[in-house]
């Protein structure tokens, strides 16, 4: 989906997604001291806004102007603020080393564009910073519930680690993978609980 399609999807009074953070975000950042955080492909802002409520100085970037506007409204409703930018995560020029935490949640792109987005994230990551990515895993297509039904935009752990390594070499960084694996996510439906399968990768920048 392009920016126009997402603008149409987000053009509702209500949030398309819940206003609460993704279930994996709070536990994965629980041990970090709040600093500056970047949410690439922030959508309606639920993760960025939650980080702001926890004391982070947040910047949210998304190519949907409608999504960005809703993120700003959600922040206002929650009594927090942030910097909200309409831009494409694959080619946005981020402040080099400007963020202590960079997150990408469910940015489902073909391989070349996904690799570019991960490079953007790594270029923005400060020394001693943390990168966290969660995405719909390829295995979800055959064994999980929901998510895109196009294998070309689904991920594997190996895909993301390859993207990270590519960015590490290209940018001359030293990165350490702290966590990389598939994780299950329970989804409530009218028919009962179902299980979605996600990719989760967390990386620390050493230098």
Report each predicted region and the residues it spans:
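A short glycine-rich, Lys/Arg-flanked "PGG" loop and its adjoining helix->strand segment in the class I
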Residues: 115-127
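Conserved class I S-adenosyl-L-methionine
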Residues: 1-32, 139
């Amino acid at each position: 989906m392009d920016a126009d399609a997402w603008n149409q999807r987000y053009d509702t009074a209500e949030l398309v997604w819940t206003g609460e953070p993704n279930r994996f975000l709070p536990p994965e950042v629980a041990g970090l001291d709040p600093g500056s955080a970047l949410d690439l492909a922030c959508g309606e802002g639920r993760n960025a806004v939650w980080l702001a409520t926890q004391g982070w100085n947040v910047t949210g970037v998304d190519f949907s102007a409608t999504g960005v506007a809703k993120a700003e409204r959600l922040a206002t409703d929650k009594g927090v603020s942030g910097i909200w930018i309409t831009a494409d995560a694959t080619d946005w020029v981020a402040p080099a080393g400007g963020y202590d935490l960079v997150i990408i949640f469910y940015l489902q792109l073909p391989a070349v564009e996904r690799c570019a987005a991960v490079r953007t994230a790594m270029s923005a990551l400060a020394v001693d910073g943390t990168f966290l990515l969660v995405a719909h895993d390829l295995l979800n297509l055959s064994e999980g519930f929901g998510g895109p039904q196009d294998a070309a935009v689904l991920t594997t752990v190996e895909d993301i680690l390859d993207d990270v390594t590519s960015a590490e070499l290209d940018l001359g960084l030293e990165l350490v993978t702290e966590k990389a694996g598939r994780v299950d996510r329970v989804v409530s439906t009218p028919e009962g609980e179902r299980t979605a399968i996600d990719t989760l990768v967390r990386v620390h920048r050493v230098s």
